[in-house]
From Swiss-Prot:
Keywords: ATP-binding, Cytoplasm, DNA damage, DNA excision, DNA repair, DNA-binding, Excision nuclease, Metal-binding, Nucleotide-binding, Repeat, SOS response, Zinc, Zinc-finger. It is found in: Cytoplasm. This is UvrABC system protein A. Forms a heterotetramer with UvrB during the search for lesions. Belongs to the ABC transporter superfamily. UvrA family. CDD domains: ABC_UvrA_I, ABC_UvrA_II. The UvrABC repair system catalyzes the recognition and processing of DNA lesions. UvrA is an ATPase and a DNA-binding protein. A damage recognition complex composed of 2 UvrA and 2 UvrB subunits scans DNA for abnormalities. When the presence of a lesion has been verified by UvrB, the UvrA molecules dissociate. GO terms for biological process: nucleotide-excision repair; SOS response. The gene is uvrA. NCBIfam families: PRK00349.1 (NF001503), uvra (TIGR00630). The keyword Hydrolase does not apply. It comes from Staphylococcus epidermidis (strain ATCC 35984 / DSM 28319 / BCRC 17069 / CCUG 31568 / BM 3577 / RP62A).
Amino acid sequence: MKGPSIVVKGARAHNLKGVDIELPKNKLIVMTGLSGSGKSSLAFDTIYAEGQRRYVESLSAYARQFLGQMDKPDVDTIEGLSPAISIDQKTTSKNPRSTVATVTEIYDYIRLLYARVGKPYCPYHGIEIESQTVQQMVDRILELEERTKIQLLAPVISHRKGSHEKLIEDIGKKGYVRLRVDDEIVDVNEVPQLDKNKNHTIEVVVDRLVVKDGIETRLADSIETALELAEGNLTVDVINGEELKFSENHACPICGFSIGELEPRMFSFNSPFGACPTCDGLGQKLKVDLDLVIPDKNKTLNEGAIEPWEPTSSDFYPTLLKRVCEVYKINMDKPYKKLTDRQKNILMNGSGEKEIEFTFTQRNGGTRKRKMVFEGVVPNIDRRYHESPSEYTREMMSKYMTELPCETCHGKRLSKEALSVYVGDYNIGEVVEYSIKNALYYFENLKLSDQDKSIADQILKEIISRLSFLNNVGLEYLTLDRSSGTLSGGEAQRIRLATQIGSRLTGVLYVLDEPSIGLHQRDNDRLINTLKEMRDLGNTLIVVEHDDDTMRAADYLVDVGPGAGNHGGEVVSSGTPNKVMKDKKSLTGQYLSGKKRIEVPEYRREITDRKIQIKGAKSNNLKNVNVDFPLSVLTVVTGVSGSGKSSLVNEILYKALAQKINKSKVKPGNFDEIKGIDQLDKIIDIDQSPIGRTPRSNPATYTGVFDDIRDVFAQTNEAKIRGYQKGRFSFNVKGGRCEACKGDGIIKIEMHFLPDVYVPCEVCDGKRYNRETLEVTYKGKNIADVLEMTVEEATHFFENIPKIKRKLQTLVDVGLGYITLGQQATTLSGGEAQRVKLASELHKRSTGRSIYILDEPTTGLHVDDISRLLKVLNRIVENGDTVVIIEHNLDVIKTADHIIDLGPEGGEGGGTIIATGTPEEIAQNKGSYTGQYLKPVLERDSVE
């Protein structure tokens, strides 16, 4: 290969079979192949892992102890490596304090902008706050009641870390006798040793006065002294009154509302200086929700209308409720909705000061008499949630609470002072509510004075450049205050991508995992141009991707396969996309060249009158839309990123159905009415969340096939002779499991400030079971051997047991024949977890009254895997059930019976129904972006 290259020899991570490959440097390299073929093992677990490990090895021993020891990948040699950065989908922060603006560091620059050129205004009078003179301060203090005792304090240290010994010594030398340290008055010579790792506030007591006539001169002199000491700031400690704060810098001349010096930390909702004191900077408060407390208002109190007070092992609350109703003459057999407002108010908010006496039965069967004020259901739930030491009680009470915007900051997260500062016409809380597209326009057209312009010029350049990168990767619809926990994997990855371009590093190896996820075809070109821009800076990009356009745009394409799991792990073909297309061995090449394809179905299923109707959908950006979801067909919901697909399907359709059918406590998005639910009795949301969060969960336990396998082992002669029941073969209970590792097969070693290390259990060698259990075999294999089989191997092994074979076959049908039965749930990718869930539904008997909801099921799937997935989904529909999919993949869209296309744009520009109908009807709609891209695909792939 001409030019510099990365040479990999003998890569054996996971299923790789000693792979040797040479990759060109400073190029856009795309790795593709079937799900489970080994492409991620080559890209992430070999090339990235070694690049990262070598970089960490070059650091000092001190720095390395914080980064942890990185294992050397199973590879002979890798030459030509650069420092590596991985941009995958797993590292989205779920921290509620993390937003799009903070993750991209745009917020840091916006805070700096507001601190440097912001103009504070009084929130009560709308007057710009300017500096106060000493005379104004004197006048304000003299307004206090006569004989009021005051202390004038000079705040020399305000909430800063350090022991501050030198400063305290200097204050003493200047002749000052007293200080107020962390709200305690102390003698300057008796200040206790301050913890240098904690924040402290130190104020010098400049003077002590009593407000009366004739103190003006002394007061003015003392104020001047304090202002000089504390750089223009003054605190007046009013004994038995509210403290006053003054500043030579900023205060309202009418009401004295004053803001200290503008600093970036004042605009941070993660700092006590900037956060709203009510919600601590979260913007939300957990409040009791009456719709969750009384889900069915047609019920009477005797029928259990107040759900959290349903009878338990103690009849405390039912007895209390009965007594309250007797005292206030509330009919317990009348539907709740027919009670008077006064009666509802007593039940929900309490009876005031009046005490109520009642006798209740305790858990031990004894009785007890109580006399108490009836606090009401709402305060009771709130109190038990906030004050109970029991985790269980708090969890139970949280079911009846909802996150609502904070009443003080109205969801803006910041203090009154921070929200009083404006740049142009907007405060910082209003600016971060903009979408990226609107924020970019705002900052590009911001009008500032010449002086402010010279101060803000560099800051604005940084803000605009970062916003431009986000705009260029198709994220213009996201708002800056959007919580990062609500972002999809693709969105989070593209945000990190934009952040990396902003850093403008060169000579770096970037490894990316399907950056096109969740991106509409329309925005793909922008993403590809971004990748090329990173390459042109002098970087090497290795992108694991299945997207047709990205593969064609690659400088170098690597097809890993030929199959998945044990049937994969080899490089089938590599070279330019054209070279791979001509390679007959390459499955990817055959699809790219058009020799293989997913056909458009010969006919579409008929749309009948059976449907779910949603009226007045208004969740997030949906604009009061009415939509029908036909039943017993395959419906695909399409639209550009941010057009409202998830709001319609996940927030409204799924949650509204789950609330009615599954009696779920989740609250759906805002809508007026939903009709047709009586035609369904089951709703299944098949998402990409893990099938379990512990190593104990695996595909065998999740699908239920492990129960049947344990039955088989319990029926063997050896098990019967020993008296072993089915439970003996469970690794979750005592008996048959290895007690050294409690059936985990691995032991966790806590490393304190290093990541926890997991090592195989030495007693059972990672087999999870004790020796006696492993002596029981079926067809020569013990239970641990079976868990180590791939699904495909197990299907052949149990082919004479129809019950087991049927369940395993569904895993094979969804393309998971390569995973092992005992593979830890935590090691499955999102796409694999989703297909395990799909398989576990497939083997259940169909009723024709079920609806399946899938959000981008093609994530992580090769086009050949998609072909298999479509067969499975069509099997579900053939049984009379309904499938609703959110999808951008044109191979899935073209096979739909019915399409609902949202748009036209993302964010505020979306939220309307652009078109509905068959793929052919959508393709004819000139206003639909989906239709524009669908039309050529339908013409190309239709059955001739």
